[in-house]
Amino acid sequence: MKRIFIIYIFLLLLGQISVSAQDINRLRERDSNYGNNSIADRNYDTMERDSTEQEEIDASSIPIELHMWNVDERLGTRSPAPVDTIYHLFQNSNLTDGYNGEYNYLGNLGSPRESRIFFNRPSHTQFMFTDPYSAFIIPPEKIMFTNTKSPFTNLTYHKAGSKRDGEDRFKAYFSVNVNKKLGIGFSFDYLYGRGLYASQSTAFFNSSFFGSYVSDHYDLHAIFSFNRLKMAENGGITDDRYITNPLDMEANSKKTPQPSDILTNLSNTWNENKGFYFFLTHHYNLGFERDKDMEAKKKDEKEFIPVTSFIHTLRVDKNERKFISYDKSADIYVHNYFQQDSVKDITKTLSIKNTLAISIREGFSSWAKAGLTGFITHEFRSFTLPDTIPGNRT
């Protein structure tokens, strides 16, 4: 809770600084109307301030205009995303089993999940250990870029349960435009689920930074996202009668067993997935200008019509997965290639993917009813796995 409170205060201060900077720009623009009578040249009195200085910025005068979009991972094609300001189903946005309960999962916030609808399952990545955590990890195509006239902040906090078995999740999103073409922002996500059952807790952290530059001839989008996911493993329950016939277990224990009382195969085992990805896509457009209003023929209003685009996309992924166990493994695993008293399984992967493309744009002429894009992709992959010989890695 202390971390969440500190982050919340930081975001409030950051938003206040951004608003203050825009207020100073407005004052400079206003004072420029007085010619050489700039802010530094004017004689201000600490007690009797100028009447213009006493003007308070009305909330209605703050410009409100927000555009959001995301980009395709392969070619960086922009897709507009209408801003959703409706509270409908907001309470379901934090559920691991999805908005409509279409996912199977292990019962705790952030635990691995799999969609029961086969056609809705995303494609598997090269690092299979993070695929079941689709509720938390944000791929590049789901990062929202913005173009806004005033700083935009979105904070959400979900809480359920008690201090013993409760769940907490705090998310923050902030974006601001430097000018009409350049925008930057970041997102933050912290999840902590204690869980109703033994050895089931989750602690996830994500931080993403993104920026965009969009103009007629050139546009660029960049993302850096870091993830750290730590989850306890229980290996399942020791006796199925806890579920199939709980009355027998109640008779044996002489009390009604609680979820946290159910014995599990593992009690001192966990896994940790840590990694980051860097995504960059940029386009250079060739085209021509024509009158924006073809009927009125207003020569002073021109619009750029792209004809051909040269595209480059880069994605770098680096991930590491640790499986640590201090439970006695001799009675659990059929084949044990590690020490009998502990397990330390570390897997690493590195992927560098480049895509080059040339695109003939749709609609630049009356006969260009469709576009055409050709691309070539090269990907480098490296995997590091533990060897059966202690101390060696392959």
Features from the language model and the residues they span:
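Outer-membrane beta-barrel channels and translocator barrels
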Residues: 148, 179, 214-218, 287-289, ...
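Sec-dependent signal peptide cleavage junction
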Residues: 17-89, 291-301
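Face-selective signature of the C-terminal outer-membrane beta-barrel domain
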Residues: 259-333, 337-394
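Transmembrane beta-strands of outer-membrane beta-barrel pores
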Residues: 157-161, 190-194, 215, 226-230, ...
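Surface-exposed extracellular loop regions of Gram-negative outer-membrane beta-barrel proteins
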Residues: 168-210, 367-383, 394
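Membrane-embedded beta-strand positions of outer-membrane beta-barrel proteins
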Residues: 155, 186, 211, 220-222, ...
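Short strand-turn segments of transmembrane beta-barrel domains in outer membranes
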Residues: 126-131, 139-174, 195-196
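Outer-membrane beta-barrel translocator/channel fold
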Residues: 102-105, 195-204, 210-276
